[in-house]
Amino acid sequence: MFEKVLSKQNLLSEKAIVVYFVLLKLVICLFPFEYGFFRDELYYIAMSDNLDFGYVDVPPLVPFLLAIVRTLFGTSFISLHLLPAVCGALVVVLTSSMVKKMGGNFNAQVLALTCVTIAPIYLFWESVYTYDAFDKLCWTLMLYVMVSLLETEDKKYWIFFGLVAGLGLMTKITILYLGFGIFLALLLTKDRKYFLSRQLWIGAVIAFLIFSP
C-alpha cells in the first residue's frame, strides 16, 4: 500500500502537484526570520489591541482576526504570519480549481500555480500581516465563484458571491473595483440575464448587511 502511494503516477498527479505548491508557499511565507517584523504589522498589532467597527484607513476584519490569533497563539513571528500564509495556500488551491474548471490541462495548472506561488508581490503580501493577503484571497474567491456560476449556471452561487463580497469589503474597500468589473462584464454580454435573478439581489443585500456596521 505504501509503495502504491509513492508510485510515480501518484507523486505526479494533479492533486499531488497542488500539495507541493501549497507546501512550498507555506514554507516560503512562514520562515523568512531574517527580515523580522514589517513596520505596518506593528500598526495592525495596535489596532488588534483596540478593536472597533472601523479605522481611519482599514476596515475591521483583519485587525479582528489578528486579535483572535494573538489570543490563541500569542504574538510570535510564526503566529503573526500564519493567516497570511494560509491565505496564500488557499489562493493556490483555488487557482488550480479555476484552471481546471476553465478547461486547462496539467501544464496549464502547473504554469498558473507557479505564477501565484512565486510571484514577488504575492510573496511579499503573504509574508507580512496586512490586509493584502486577505484581500487577494477575497478577490480570488469572488472569481472562483463567478467561474463556478458560469460553468454550472446555478444561480445559488450569487448567495456565496454576496457573502464573499461582504467579507471582502470588511477587508479592503478596493474590492469594489472587481465588483464593478464583473458588473460591466455581465452588462455587456449575454450573461446580463442574471440581473433578473432573485439570488443576485439577495447576494447584494447580504454583502451590504455584512459591510453596513
Report residues per predicted region:
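Short acidic/glycine- and proline-prone juxtamembrane loop motifs at membrane-interface regions
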Residues: 127-135
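Perimembrane helix-loop-helix junctions
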Residues: 151, 178-208
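Membrane-interface alpha helices of multi-pass inner-membrane proteins
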Residues: 50, 145, 157-173, 211
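Membrane-interface transmembrane helices that cradle and orient dolichyl/undecaprenyl
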Residues: 100-103, 142-157
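Short helix- or helix-capping micro-motifs
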Residues: 21-22, 112-117, 165, 169
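Transmembrane-helix signature of polytopic, membrane-embedded enzymes
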Residues: 14, 90, 95-118, 136-137
